[in-house]
A protein has these predicted regions:
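Conserved hydrophobic/aromatic packing and binding residues within compact polymer-binding modules
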Residues: 8, 22-23, 33-36
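Residues in the helix-turn-helix
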Residues: 21, 32, 61-64
C-alpha cells in the first residue's frame, strides 16, 4: 500500500466508516473506493475531492491527502522537485514584495569583543559567526569569505543580509557546495537554490558558488568531526556537522593552510553558474550560442515580446524609446529568428498580464527598452497576441501561482537554465545554470505545470484578452479630444 492509500484507510476508520457504508452514504462508486484504500488503483482528483468532502475532514487533513495523492500520481521524486521549485518562487515573491534582496538594518550592535574561541551551543556558535563576519566586513577594504557550509543552510545568508547594508561594502564569497549524485535526491540539489538565488540577487554580495558530486548523505554528517568551515583573511571558523559548536582560529599558519587547501578543492569542483550584474554584458551572455536552440521553455510575468509584436514593431519601439540599444538589434534580430523557429512553451502569470493591460508595464527585454506601453500600443500588442495565441504553447498561470514580477526564467534544450532578475536598467542579475540535476528538475517541473491546477483554461484566457482590448479601446475613446 502507498502512503496515500494508507492515509485514506486511516481517515475512513477514524470517521467511523468502512468502504460499503461510505459509498452508500456519499454515493461514491464502491469499486473505485475499495481500490483507492487498498492501493490497487489511483482514482481521479475529483473522486478524491468527493472522498474528503464526504468525510468532512479538516483543511489540514485535506491538504495532506491531496499532497499524498499528487505524490502518488507523479512520483515522489517529481513531487519533491515540484514542491521545492514552487517554494523557491514563493520565497522570491516575498523578497520582491519586501522591496529588495537587501534591507537596511535598524540596529547597530557596536563593537563586538571575543571572550572565548570555542562555542558549545547554537547560540554561542551564532555569536562566533557574527563576530567573524562583522570583523571581516569592518576591517577589510575588500572583504572575502570562503566556505563549504551546506548549500541549504540559512545561517550565513541571514547574517550577511543583516550586516552588508550597515557598511556599504561589497563582499566576495566563494562557496563550495556538495551535490547529490543520486537522481532520487535531486531535490536536495534544488533546495540549495533557496539560498543561492537570493544571494546572487543581493546588492553588495559577489557570490560565486562551486559544486562537486558526492554520495555523502545528510545521515552521514553526525559521524564527521567539524566538517564545515568559514575562512576569512584573519579567521578560520570550524563548525560541527549540525552547526551547534564552533572553534575559531586566528593563527596565520592555520589560515594559510586552510586557504591553500580551499583553493585546491575549487580546482576539483565546477562553477555552478555564470552570472553578470551588468546590463550590456548580460545581453551578450543571453544571446550566446542561440543558434543551437531547438527547444525553449520560458516563465515570465507577461507573455514573450515576440508574442506581443512582430520584430519590426519591436525594433521601431526600441529606436523610439531606447536608441542606445540600437547596436544590439542586429544580433537580437538573428536571435529572435531562431527563437521563432524553435519548439516553444511559454508560461506567464495572470497578475503580470493584468498589470501590463492596466498600466502598460511589461517584463523581460521589453521592460528594459520600452519604459511603458501606451493604451494604443497595448491594444496593438493584445490583438497580435490573441491572433497568434496557441493553447499548446501559451499558458496563463492563475492567481494561486506565486511568482515575482521581476524574474524571467528560460530553459534551453533542457540543459541550460537562465534566471534573470530585472528590477530596472540599473538593477539586473543574470544567471546561467547548466548543472544536469537542476536543469532536469526544471524540465520536468514545466511538463507537470502545463497540465496542473495552476493553468487558466484557454477559453477564459481568450475572454480576458478580449475584455482588456475592449476596455483599452474605451479608454482611448474617452481621452481622445
Amino acid at each position: 500500500m502507498s502512503k496515500f492509500s494508507e492515509k485514506c484507510k486511516e481517515l475512513l476508520t477514524e470517521n467511523g466508516y468502512n468502504v460499503y457504508r461510505l459509498s452508500q452514504a456519499a454515493s461514491l462508486e464502491r469499486t473505485t473506493l475499495q481500490r483507492m484504500v487498498t492501493g490497487k488503483r489511483l482514482p481521479g482528483p475529483e473522486f478524491v475531492e468527493q472522498f474528503c468532502q464526504a468525510l468532512r475532514i479538516s483543511l489540514p487533513e485535506k491538504k495532506e491527502i491531496m499532497d499524498l495523492y499528487k505524490m502518488e500520481a507523479i512520483g515522489e521524486t517529481a513531487y519533491r522537485n515540484q514542491t521545492t521549485i514552487l517554494h523557491l518562487f514563493e520565497k522570491l515573491s516575498t523578497l520582491e514584495k519586501n522591496k529588495g534582496f537587501n534591507k537596511r538594518s535598524i540596529v547597530d550592535y557596536g563593537e563586538m569583543k571575543l571572550i572565548s574561541p570555542i562555542s558549545n551551543d547554537k547560540y554561542e556558535t551564532e555569536l562566533l559567526l557574527q563576530y567573524v563576519l562583522r570583523k571581516t566586513i569592518q576591517e577589510q577594504e575588500s572583504p572575502e569569505l570562503y566556505t563549504n557550509l551546506p548549500g541549504t543552510d540559512t545561517l550565513l545568508p541571514h547574517y550577511l543580509n543583516l550586516m552588508i547594508p550597515q557598511y556599504g561594502k561589497a563582499i566576495l564569497i566563494k562557496h563550495l557546495i556538495h551535490f547529490q549524485t543520486n537522481a532520487s535526491y535531486a531535490y536536495e540539489n534544488l533546495e540549495t537554490l533557496h539560498q543561492i538565488i537570493p544571494l546572487c540577487f543581493s546588492a553588495g554580495i559577489n557570490y560565486i558558488p562551486f559544486y562537486y558530486y558526492s554520495k555523502l548523505s545528510r545521515n552521514d554528517r553526525p559521524n564527521l568531526l567539524y566538517p564545515f568551515y568559514i575562512i576569512t583573511e584573519k579567521y578560520v571558523l570550524q563548525l560541527a556537522s549540525d552547526l551547534s559548536k564552533g572553534i575559531l582560529h586566528s593563527d596565520p599558519a592555520i589560515l594559510q593552510e586552510y586557504t591553500k587547501e580551499f583553493q585546491n578543492c575549487l580546482e576539483h569542483s565546477s562553477p555552478l553558474l555564470q552570472q553578470s550584474k551588468n546590463l550590456d554584458e548580460a545581453l551578450q551572455l543571453y544571446m550566446t550560442s542561440f543558434d543551437t536552440i531547438q527547444d525553449i521553455t520560458s516563465l515570465d510575468a507577461t507573455p514573450c515580446d515576440s508574442d506581443f509584436m512582430d520584430n519590426e514593431y519591436f525594433f521601431d519601439r526600441v529606436k523610439e524609446h531606447s536608441p542606445e540599444y540600437a547596436p544590439f538589434m542586429n544580433a537580437y534580430k538573428s536571435f529572435l529568428n531562431v527563437i521563432n523557429q524553435a519548439n516553444r512553451n511559454d508560461f506567464f502569470t495572470i497578475n503580470g498580464f493584468q498589470k501590463y493591460c492596466e498600466y502598460g508595464i511589461s517584463s523581460g527585454t521589453s521592460s528594459i527598452v520600452i519604459p511603458k506601453f501606451s493604451p494604443e500600443e497595448r491594444i496593438t500588442s493584445l490583438k497580435y497576441f490573441l491572433e497568434h495565441f496557441s493553447n499548446e504553447n501559451h499558458h496563463m498561470l492563475n492567481s494561486t501561482f506565486s511568482y515575482p514580477d521581476s524574474l524571467y526564467i528560460e530553459l534551453r534544450n533542457n540543459h541550460s537554465l537562465f534566471l534573470i532578475n530585472l528590477a530596472d536598467k540599473a538593477n539586473i542579475s543574470f544567471i546561467i545554470i547548466q548543472e544536469s540535476s537542476i536543469c532536469n528538475a526544471f524540465s520536468e517541473f514545466f511538463q507537470l505545470l502545463a497540465d496542473s491546477e495552476y493553468i487558466t483554461p484557454e477559453n477564459q484566457t481568450r475572454t480576458l484578452i478580449q475584455k482588456y482590448i475592449r476596455q483599452l479601446k474605451q479608454l482611448t475613446f474617452d481621452i481622445t479630444p
